[in-house]
């Protein structure tokens, strides 16, 4: 594993456990153990008073081509994996998305095989979902905004009965600490060191993922339903570094072109190497 603990120096105080952003360090009996979910971040070193933590023999493998292939094969995924990487301006090698387009629509294109990465900003967004993924809101005049709400969001046959329900439940989800200039969205194998990955899967595949994620740590993956796909998918993984799954909403499912049995899971990328390793260690590896 990337980091190891010197048993002669460790006093098992647990400071590293409480400060590990990946929840990758656990207590086993009287010992503190760094699990395979360690991502080389080194945060734990700064909190170890005894200087008991050092680099191990192995390093986390963040090769996106290798990880994309491994996830696809081990989970028997039928669709491609989307990667997201936030930045203040587009990378030189990535095309600026001109729009109008939906975040969920771009994801759907990549799920279905589009091999092009794009840099997505509010200017290219067709809806307010850009604010829900941490890049700020679109600009619109009052008449346009009211027309969109009344035509597609509010009232009988739409998403909410009344306008006051729009923001209800938003406080469940974390606030973004900053507004990014935009986000690169592309196939996982094309985006180096992304912040997040997101992909569709069925119930059994989700069970495989959650079992592998918690195999060494006992961590669970929370699921959400009832708000927009973008908000439910992105906020927790990006802000709190923990994976989530969700059923999506009407628009998100439509533009992602999800099948009836599919929902989506979003993972912080730094957790993916450990996830891939553990997929070979659970009960599902016996099948």
Language model features: what each stretch is:
Residues 68-287:
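Acidic, serine/proline-rich low-complexity intrinsically disordered regions
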Residues 1-12, 23-40, 54-63:
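Ferredoxin-like iron-sulfur electron-transfer modules
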Residues 18, 25, 47-49, 211-213, ...:
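Surface-exposed beta-strand edges and their flanking turn/coil or helix-capping segments
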Residues 9-22, 37-50, 106, 129:
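Short, cysteine/histidine-rich loop/knuckle motifs that typically chelate Zn2+
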Residues 26, 48, 55-56, 218-222:
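Short, surface-exposed linear patches
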């Amino acid at each position: 594993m990337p980091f190891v603990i010197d048993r002669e120096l460790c006093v098992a105080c647990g400071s590293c456990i409480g400060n590990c952003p990946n929840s990758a360090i656990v207590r086993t009996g009287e010992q503190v153990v760094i699990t395979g979910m360690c991502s080389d971040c080194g945060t734990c070193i700064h909190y170890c008073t005894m200087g008991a933590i050092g680099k191990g023999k192995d390093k986390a493998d963040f090769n996106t081509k290798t990880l994309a292939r491994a996830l696809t094969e081990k989970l028997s995924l039928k669709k491609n994996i989307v990667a997201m990487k936030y930045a203040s301006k587009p990378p030189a090698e990535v095309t600026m998305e001109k729009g109008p387009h939906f975040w969920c629509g771009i994801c759907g294109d990549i799920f279905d095989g589009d091999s092009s990465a794009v840099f997505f900003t509010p200017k290219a967004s067709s809806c307010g979902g850009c604010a829900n993924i941490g890049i700020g809101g679109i600009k619109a005049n009052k008449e346009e905004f009211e027309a969109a709400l009344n035509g597609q969001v509010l009232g009988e046959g739409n998403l909410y009965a009344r306008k006051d329900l729009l923001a209800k439940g938003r406080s469940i989800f974390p606030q973004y600490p900053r507004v990014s200039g935009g986000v690169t969205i592309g196939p996982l194998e094309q985006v180096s060191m992304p912040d997040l990955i997101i992909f569709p899967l069925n119930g059994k595949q989700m069970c495989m993922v959650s079992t592998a994620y918690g195999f060494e740590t006992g961590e669970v993956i929370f699921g959400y339903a009832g708000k927009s796909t973008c908000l439910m998918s992105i906020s927790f993984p990006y802000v709190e570094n923990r994976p989530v799954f969700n059923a999506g909403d009407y628009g998100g499912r439509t533009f992602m072109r999800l099948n009836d049995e599919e929902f989506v899971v979003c993972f912080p990328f730094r957790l993916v190497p450990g996830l891939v390793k553990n997929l070979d260690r659970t009960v599902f590896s016996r099948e």
